[in-house]
Amino acid sequence: MTFDLASRLAARRAEHLYRRRPLLQSPQGPEVTVDGERLLAFSSNDYLGLANHPEVIAALQQGAATWGVGGGASHLVIGHSTPHHRLEEALAEFTGRPRALLFSTGYMANLAAVTALVGQGDTVLEDRLNHASLLDAGLLSGARFSRYLHNDASSLAKRLEKASGNTLVVTDGVFSMDGDLADLPALCAEAKRHGAWVMVDDAHGFGPLGATGGGIAEHFGLGIDEVPVLVGTLGKAFGTAGAFVAGSEELIETLIQFARPYIYTTSQPPAVACATLKSLELLRSEGWRREHLNRLVARFREGAARIGLTLMASPTPIQPVLVGSSERALRLSALLRERGILVGAIRPPTVPAGSARLRITLTAAHTDAQLERLLEALAECWALMPEECDDA
């Protein structure tokens, strides 16, 4: 018996689900070169526009000159350098937690935290729309795994009543494909009533949310008692790479001792930690970036409503435009690209069948004029959709 990979790929193409990697030939920013074409992009998670910031670049360059390039080894061997340690201390202070622990990717941070905290005999309860890394972590943990209805505290409560062993409630802070916020006050209250811990992956919340960019926990005024396990990603609003888990002394020491994705992975380049220290400084000191971004979000939603687009209840830079079928989403994306606008079409299995969408992401680097250009292009392209696609 052989692996029939050709048939799998053919089926993927027939379902309009085949994915291709666009080739970025320029730095991150609103205007990019992709596959040889100059485009205005609304596809990046660089929410605060820090990925190409000259001070962040300079910090990376100086870090490489001082510390070299590679991490060299795992953190527990000889890969934990001074920049890593300083960044962990800065992230702990930023999040209001005693400790923080660096990881190479957000996927690894989520996998590490869940699998180190629960196992056979325990329970992990997750939002149905959680990121794939969280769902994978729950399945791989060996714990009893169940998903509650999206953002539904009563659905969570029913599952908490049946939970056994140590129970971990896991949710995205900002849901990456919908842009809505987890109802953390209600979820945390239910978890506390049942003696469960809450873990929040705030990959898309740090930077845009909170008075100082502290994310969804700061947005709702929740501390370590309500959210014992807080995960953040550095490759989005921070504009660099990697991730972290913040929490108590005991939590971080537990991850160091038991989290296999941490123990058996080479550390990230120290120079990246140097760059992230600078981006964290800018994230906290340049509040105008959040203010400008929030204004762009409000203006986009007003303009989209005038066009008649179907949006989701998102107060964040993630602004999905619901289209329906995968074919329809691809068509709208292609029409925008013909007009020099790059917006990705999100299709199943990333989102449920029948809910394909354009995932528009706004950043602090976008100008008012660029937003107006997007809205004008959307209005023009949307007017063409009923004639060309009637499968909505």
Swiss-Prot record:
Coiled-coil stretches: none
Q: Which InterPro entries match?
A: Aminotrans_II_pyridoxalP_BS, Aminotransferase_I/II_large, AON_synthase_class-II, AONS_Archaea/Proteobacteria, AONS_Proteobacteria, PyrdxlP-dep_Trfase, PyrdxlP-dep_Trfase_major, PyrdxlP-dep_Trfase_small
Which reaction does this chain catalyze?
A: 6-carboxyhexanoyl-[ACP] + L-alanine + H(+) = (8S)-8-amino-7-oxononanoate + holo-[ACP] + CO2
Keywords for the protein's UniProt record, in alphabetical order:
Biotin biosynthesis, Pyridoxal phosphate, Transferase
EC class of this enzyme? transferase
Q: Which residues bind pyridoxal 5'-phosphate?
A: G106, Y107, S176, H204, T233
Q: In which pathway does it act?
A: Cofactor biosynthesis; biotin biosynthesis
**GO BP of this protein:** biotin biosynthetic process
Where in this protein does the record say N6-(pyridoxal phosphate)lysine is found?
A: K236
Q: Which GO terms describe its molecular function?
A: 8-amino-7-oxononanoate synthase activity; pyridoxal phosphate binding
Annotated substrate binding sites: R19, H131, T350
Role description: Catalyzes the decarboxylative condensation of pimeloyl-[acyl-carrier protein] and L-alanine to produce 8-amino-7-oxononanoate (AON), [acyl-carrier protein], and carbon dioxide.
- PANTHER family found in the cross-reference section: 8-AMINO-7-OXONONANOATE SYNTHASE, CLASS II AMINOTRANSFERASE/8-AMINO-7-OXONONANOATE SYNTHASE
The entry assigns this protein to a family as follows: Belongs to the class-II pyridoxal-phosphate-dependent aminotransferase family. BioF subfamily.
Fill in the subunit field for this protein. Answer: Homodimer.
What name goes with this protein?
8-amino-7-oxononanoate synthase
**Species this protein is from:** Stutzerimonas stutzeri (strain A1501)
Q: Which gene encodes it?
A: bioF
